[in-house]
Structures are given as structure tokens and as C-alpha cells.
């Protein structure tokens, strides 16, 4: 499965895609987003990961799901993203 990142602006809100790595909190998921960039000097492809806490109102995500999250107003100390849609369910 390709975990390609698409960062676009839809009505000035960022949209990211990633894999759910934790769903242990109530109405909260942790999504790991992968970014690929070239090193400036060595021109090697560098892969970096970042984890985002996202709001899952219906608690429908499970670990391993490929999801799309959208930027939103601050919901807690760490949550500034919400689940937009589930692209692919985990097997």
C-alpha cells in the first residue's frame, strides 16, 4: 500500500493522508503521516514521519486504516485535526 502524502488546501484548510497507529483514546486517533523530500546536499530521498492527533466523532477508525484528516479549530491541547474520510480499511 502506498502511503503517499497529498497536501492540498481546500478552503484554506490543510488535508493530509496517513495511517492510523493508535485508537486507544475516546474519540481520538493518532495518524502517522509520511513525507518524502530530497536532501539538499546529497540528493538522497529522505522519508520523515510525523504523528497527528485527530478527532474521530463516531469512533469508526481502527489501527491500520488509511485515512484523510483535515485541519480544524483546536479541540484540545493536542488535537487540531479531524477525520475527513476513511480511504481504505485495514485487513
UniProtKB/Swiss-Prot annotation:
It comes from Malacoplasma penetrans (strain HF-2) (Mycoplasma penetrans). It comes from the Bacteria. One of its GO terms (molecular function) is rRNA binding. Part of the 30S ribosomal subunit. Belongs to the universal ribosomal protein uS17 family. GO terms for cellular component: cytosolic small ribosomal subunit. One of the primary rRNA binding proteins, it binds specifically to the 5'-end of 16S ribosomal RNA. The gene is rpsQ. The keyword Ribonucleoprotein applies. InterPro entries: NA-bd_OB-fold, Ribosomal_uS17, Ribosomal_uS17_bact/chlr, Ribosomal_uS17_CS. Keywords: Ribonucleoprotein, Ribosomal protein, RNA-binding, rRNA-binding. GO terms for biological process: translation. This is Small ribosomal subunit protein uS17.
Amino acid at each position: 500500500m502506498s502511503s503517499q502524502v497529498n497536501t492540498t488546501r481546500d478552503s484554506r484548510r490543510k488535508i493530509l493522508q496517513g495511517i492510523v497507529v493508535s485508537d486507544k483514546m475516546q474519540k481520538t486517533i493518532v495518524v502517522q503521516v509520511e513525507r518524502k523530500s530530497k536532501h539538499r546536499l546529497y540528493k538522497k530521498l529522505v522519508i520523515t514521519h510525523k504523528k497527528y492527533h485527530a478527532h474521530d466523532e463516531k469512533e469508526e477508525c481502527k489501527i491500520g486504516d488509511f485515512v484523510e484528516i483535515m485541519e480544524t479549530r483546536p479541540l484540545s491541547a493536542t488535537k487540531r485535526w479531524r477525520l475527513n474520510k476513511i480511504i481504505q480499511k485495514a485487513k
